[in-house]
Amino acid sequence: MSVFPPEPKMGWNLHVTVAAVVENAGRFLLVEEETIDGVRLNQPAGHLDEGESLLAACSREALEETAHRVVPRALVGVYQWPRSDGEITYVRFAFAADLAGFEEGRVLDKGILRAVWMTRDELAACPERHRSPLVLRCIDDYLAGRRYPLDLIRHYD
């Protein structure tokens, strides 16, 4: 028996993503987005761009998807989730973020229908509309007080 991990299968892809967990008066900022599975709910989230820091990606994705400017203040968690077809594994860095402004009239990213504010219970009542299990998990971890300092993450240019 080999002590080495198996070779990764051909076609396996790792996607690094970020998500902003933004709470205001007991409601969380979410997006309704079009997916191949229909309209789904998600945090403002997306892929890390080449050369971009995780913190910059979090702020950028929130702005592009909701027109809200946000400032990450803590890491909520790091989540590994393999898509059901096994072709993609997502590693999501979820950040607690504060609102820092709103750009009225900003055109949202393609596929984003609108930004919505929902309570945890409202979100939990419609699991069939979640983009992934990470949507509620990140909010539950946030509500459980999980916060890690941002200096845990190092970005080198």
Model-derived regions: residue spans:
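Acidic, metal-coordinating catalytic segment for phosphate/diphosphate chemistry
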Residues: 1-19
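Conserved beta-strand and immediately adjacent loop positions that scaffold enzyme active sites
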Residues: 19, 27, 114
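Unchanged
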Residues: 48-71, 81-134, 155-157
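Conserved Nudix-box catalytic region and its N-terminal flanking loop in Nudix hydrolases
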Residues: 24-64
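Charged phosphate-binding loop/patch that engages nucleotide di/tri-phosphates or the phosphate backbone
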Residues: 137-157
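Hydrophobic/basic alpha-helical segments enriched in Actinobacteria
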Residues: 17, 23, 73-76, 120, ...
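Short, solvent-exposed loop/turn elements at beta->coil junctions and helix N-caps
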Residues: 8, 76-84
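Short connector loops at helix/strand junctions that flank enzyme active sites
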Residues: 15, 23, 43, 70, ...
